């Protein structure tokens, strides 16, 4: 009986590459010349620092663009609402969603059940296990999960026949 797991993970290596590319782009940008701005990655948190709030938001856009180039889904970003002002700099913290939260997992299971596909889905910790009689049904579930607007990117692993 075919089965698969739906998970939400961020590729650590690609994320680090995206941050490094963002730092490289920041150094070459004309609008940041002579300004105090930085992008740092530590403990799965990206810290964006700039001289004003507008520039912090520009840094978020730079990071988002570089993440999409490196095939890291920007939907996994969790950006602070307000920039923290300390001294003459503003800083934003960007966290990344790892694992599927229980509420999102319940919505995903309900979405799968409402689709009337002949599959069973169950929540297992921070992933959702889907089993069905045919591989085609699982592929339809994959398409359904990708199209869903649940605010989180999904990956599929442990696909077994």
Swiss-Prot record:
UniProt KW keywords: Nucleotide-binding
Classification via InterPro entries: DUF520, UPF0234-like_C, UPF0234_N, YajQ-like_sf
Role played: Nucleotide-binding protein.
GO terms of molecular function: nucleotide binding
One Pfam entry name: DUF520
Matching Gene3D superfamilies: 3.30.70.860, YajQ-like, domain 2
Record bears the keyword Protease: no
Source organism (scientific name): Shewanella halifaxensis (strain HAW-EB4)
Full protein name: Nucleotide-binding protein Shal_3198
One GO term describing the cellular component: cytosol
SUPFAM superfamilies: YajQ-like
Transmembrane segment boundaries: none
Family membership: Belongs to the YajQ family.
């Amino acid at each position: 009986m075919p089965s698969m797991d739906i998970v939400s993970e961020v590729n650590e290596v690609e994320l680090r590459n995206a941050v490094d590319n963002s730092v490289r782009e920041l150094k070459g940008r004309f609008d940041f010349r002579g300004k105090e701005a930085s992008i740092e990655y530590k403990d799965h948190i990206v810290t964006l620092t700039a001289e004003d709030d507008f520039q912090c938001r520009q840094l978020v856009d730079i990071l988002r663009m570089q993440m999409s180039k490196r095939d890291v889904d920007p939907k996994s970003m969790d950006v602070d609402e307000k920039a923290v002002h300390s001294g003459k700099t503003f800083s934003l913290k960007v966290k990344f969603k790892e694992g599927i939260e229980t509420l999102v997992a319940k919505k995903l299971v309900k979405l799968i059940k409402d689709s009337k596909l002949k599959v069973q889905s169950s929540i297992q910790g921070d992933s959702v296990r889907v089993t069905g009689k045919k591989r085609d049904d699982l592929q339809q579930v994959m398409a359904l999960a990708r199209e869903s607007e649940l605010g989180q990117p999904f990956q599929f692993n442990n696909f077994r026949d």
